[in-house]
Amino acid sequence: MAVRSFAELPALLEALMRGHDRVALVYFDAFAWRFAERHGDHPLLRDAEVERWASQFPSTTAVHTTTIHSGLPVGEHGIYEWNVYEPRLDRLITPLWHSFAGDGERGTLLRVGIRGADLFPFEPLYARWEWPSYTAFPAAYAFSPATECLAASATVLSFGTTADGLELLARALGSEERGYGTIHLPELDTHMHLAGPDEPQVDAIVTATLDAIRAAPWPSGTVVLVTSDHGMAAISPERTSYVNVVWPELPDHLAHGADGKPLAPAGSARDLFLHVLPDRLEEVAARLGELLAEKADVRRVDDLVAEGVFGEVGERLRERLANLVVLPHADEAAYWLEPGRFEQRFLGQHGGLSPDEVEIPLVRWLSA
C-alpha cells in the first residue's frame, strides 16, 4: 500500500470534520514512526488505528507547521526550511522566529518593517471553515508574528506544560457543539536536538506524552489524531563537516545577499542548501561532491524537483529555493561555520530523506 504524505492531512481533517462533531489534531513534534512502533503496546496506540505516513521534503517543522495551518503543501507555500531565502530582503531568514537567520532571537524582522503577513500571506484553513477552531501553542510563541498569521480566525490557546495544553484544548472543544482543535507539542523535538534520538529519556517523554493525550478530557466521540512533522537522525558536532572549512574558497562561488555575506546556510545540518552562482554550479557540485564523497550526497536542486521530491513546485517555493543541496549520510552532518552565529552543536537533527527523518505515524483514536 502506498504511504500517504503529510501534504494530504489538511484534506483529511476537513473530511473528518464533515462527518464528526469534533476533531483534534495533536501535532507531536518529532514523533517518528519508529517511536510509534516501539511504543505500540501503549494503551493509546493499542486502541487506535495507526498508519505509516511520510513527511514532506524537507522534513522540517517550518514546512509542516505552515502546511497544517494554511492547508497548502510546501510547493505552494514556499516555507521549505528553518532558514530560507527571502526575496524581498535578499537575505536568509528564519520564518517561524520572524528573524534574520542566525540572529538567535525572535522578532528581529519587525525592526525592518516586515510583518508576519509578509512571510505568511495565506488565508488559514480556519478562515475557510464554518466551524469554530482552536489552536494551542506553548506560551513562548503562542502570539508570535508567525502564529498570529497562521492561526488567524482561530482562537489561540497558550499553555505551559503538555498536560495543561491538552486539557485546555479538550475543554475548549467541549464548550462547542461542533469544533476543530490542534496543539503543537515540541518537548520531544527539543530534547532530541540536544541529547540525541537514542538517549534513554526519549522513551520516557514519548510515554508521558501519550499518557497525557489519553488522559485529556476529550468530549465523548472526539476523533483524536496524533501525528508528527518529521523524525530525528543522530548526529554530533564532532562528525559535522563545515563546507566552508572543507573548501575555504567556497564563499567566492556563492551568491551574496544584501548584507554582503554569502547566502548560507539555508536549510539545516541534514539538508544544507547553498545558493551557488549559476555559472559556478557545475564546478561547485563536482568539487563538493569530491570533498564530501564519504560523508554526503551533493545534489542539484533542479534534479530533485524533476524527481518530484518537493511535489508540485509553485512560484513561492521556486523563488526561495537554493540550487544545490548537501544531504549527509547516516550519522553525518554538514553545515556552515560562522562562529557565534552558525555552528552545529546538536546531537539530533532532521531535514533529510532518511527513514528515521521521514517516516511518521498517523494515529486515529476515538475518545470514549
Each PLM stretch: what is its role?
Residues 1-368:
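Feature captures the catalytic ectodomains and active-site-proximal regions of enzymes
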